[in-house]
Regions:
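A short SAM/SAH-binding and catalytic strip from SAM-dependent methyltransferases
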Residues: 107-120
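Class I SAM-dependent methyltransferase SAM/SAH-binding core
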Residues: 49-97
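Conserved Class I S-adenosyl-L-methionine
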Residues: 180-245
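Short, glycine-/aromatic-enriched active-site segment of Class I SAM-dependent methyltransferases
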Residues: 139-157
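Conserved class I S-adenosyl-L-methionine
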Residues: 37-46
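A short glycine-rich, Lys/Arg-flanked "PGG" loop and its adjoining helix->strand segment in the class I
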Residues: 121-136
Length: 245
């Protein structure tokens, strides 16, 4: 099974691909979308969960999403049509790091997709190329709450702690105007949902080759989370504006 399919199945019951509740997502979007008529871009949109919420909450917003997964984009398009917002959503099958647009955006999102750019600061650099003057960037990325094991670093990356993460963002020329640190409940709910949704899909197909493969992937992920990074990993979402210019 390819990783894109595994990710789609794992997020079936938690379409926001980050450890955030619906209420946390709503607050973050409300802090980034201030007028209600913004052009919004999501770099690494997956199934479009962030954009669907933005469009549903703000009838004047138009949005564009970029992702490398055709399957995820198809899901986003179908969900947008079902919600009656498809006419305000444009989807691009493209590498988010290489995407370009002729018009700037008032809000640029990239939550949980820093790996596509090579880290948090490169993500901000990419977002800035699409950002209109005075616009907002909403990013979400991991940090270490505690000293990580070597295995955890190998799995997830060499993050900083929370103060250093925010300091790096500020030193890069950005000012946080809002933020959210995911709670233990949000972090655990996300991981239980990820592994549980994938495992449930697999158990319903226990006699099929993909069923066994998916069940093994869910089991491996659950073990790595519980043993290697549950105590150390944290997640922060930041709403940012350029400090000058």
């Amino acid at each position: 099974m390819d990783r894109q399919l595994i990710s789609m199945l794992a997020h079936a019951d938690h379409p926001i691909a980050a450890p955030l509740t619906d209420e946390s997502v709503r607050r973050l979007l409300d802090r980034a979308i201030r007028r209600g008529d913004e052009r919004v871009l999501d770099l690494g949109c997956g199934g479009g969960a962030w954009l669907l919420r933005a469009l549903a909450a703000h009838p004047g917003v138009t949005a564009e999403g970029v992702d490398v997964s055709e399957r995820a984009l198809a899901t986003a398009g179908e969900a947008a049509a079902a919600r009656g917002v498809r006419d305000r959503l444009v989807l691009h099958h493209h590498d988010a790091a290489e995407f370009s647009s002729t018009r700037p955006f008032d809000v640029v999102l990239s939550v949980g997709a820093a790996h596509a750019f090579g880290g948090l600061l490169p993500t901000l650099a990419a977002a800035e190329t699409h950002l209109a003057p005075g616009g907002h960037v909403l990013v979400g990325d991991g940090y270490w709450e505690d000293t990580p094991s070597a295995d955890a670093i190998e799995m997830l990356g060499d993050f900083a702690d929370l103060p250093a993460t925010v300091d790096r963002v500020v030193a890069d020329g950005w000012t946080p105007v809002y933020g959210h640190v995911s709670t233990r409940e949000e972090l655990d709910d996300y991981e239980w949902s990820w592994t549980g949704s994938l495992a449930s899909w697999a158990l319903d197909r226990s006699r099929e080759p993909h069923g066994a493969e998916a069940l093994a992937a869910a089991s491996t992920h659950r073990s790595e989370w519980l043993r290697d990074y549950r105590k150390a990993f944290g997640f922060v979402s930041l709403v940012l504006r350029r400090t000058s210019g």
